[in-house]
């Protein structure tokens, strides 16, 4: 997605009914999957690498739909019309996680496997702080809009660029606090990750969550 469509979506989506936004996202995803392009090719390659088989057209379309719906959910989370998104969250084990954070920050190593903004918003709405790291995207104005959205939901965001380390900053920010620190660990952008088996190949994953 380029900045112009996303910028327009930031302004328009929160004013529309949730079902309309999600229907538009599904339609756009079907069109994108059919047209193809660099993003679709990369997604197809990643799916094949994880599963060992080339995804079918239906599987690829479902994956694209999930990806686009994630963006749509993000845009709706800060609006009154997006309230059903939080009402639909079920967090098994949250009480234990919240209790553990009373003794200090709890670090979670996560993968790119779901709508973590939705989960983070739910956690903040239930009285527990979130501190996390987000990759800086271009242009900066787009990144700032995503940061503002997440901060509006109660999360604290530390931006990180490719090749940059925010490890010390993160430690200083969370030390001694009763917060949850969810970190996406299945992709390294610092250049100092750990090589591991992932799917049918090798991949660099972030070392930060384990080090914390």
What is the predicted role of each segment?
Residues 81-212:
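Soluble catalytic domains of membrane acyltransferases
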Residues 1-110, 143-148, 154:
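Membrane-anchoring hydrophobic helices of lipid-metabolizing enzymes
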């Amino acid at each position: 997605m380029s900045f112009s469509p996303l910028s327009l979506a930031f302004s328009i989506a929160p004013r529309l009914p949730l079902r309309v936004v999600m229907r538009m996202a599904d339609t756009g995803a079907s069109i994108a999957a059919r047209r193809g392009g660099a993003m679709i090719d990369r997604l197809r390659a990643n799916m094949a690498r994880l599963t060992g088989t080339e995804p079918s057209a239906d599987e690829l379309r479902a994956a694209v739909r999930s990806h686009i719906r994630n963006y749509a959910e993000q845009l709706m989370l800060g609006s009154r019309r997006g309230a059903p998104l939080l009402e639909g969250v079920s967090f098994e084990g949250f009480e234990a996680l919240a209790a553990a954070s009373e003794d200090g920050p709890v670090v979670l190593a996560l993968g790119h496997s779901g709508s973590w903004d939705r989960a983070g918003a739910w956690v903040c709405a239930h009285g527990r702080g979130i501190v996390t790291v987000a990759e800086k995207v271009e242009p900066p104005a787009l990144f700032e809009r995503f940061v503002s959205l997440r901060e509006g939901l109660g999360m604290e965001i530390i931006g990180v660029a490719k090749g940059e380390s925010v490890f010390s900053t993160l430690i200083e920010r969370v030390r001694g606090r009763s917060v949850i620190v969810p970190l996406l660990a299945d992709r390294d952008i610092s250049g100092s990750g750990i090589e591991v088996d992932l799917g049918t190949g090798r991949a660099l994953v972030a070392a930060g969550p384990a080090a914390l």
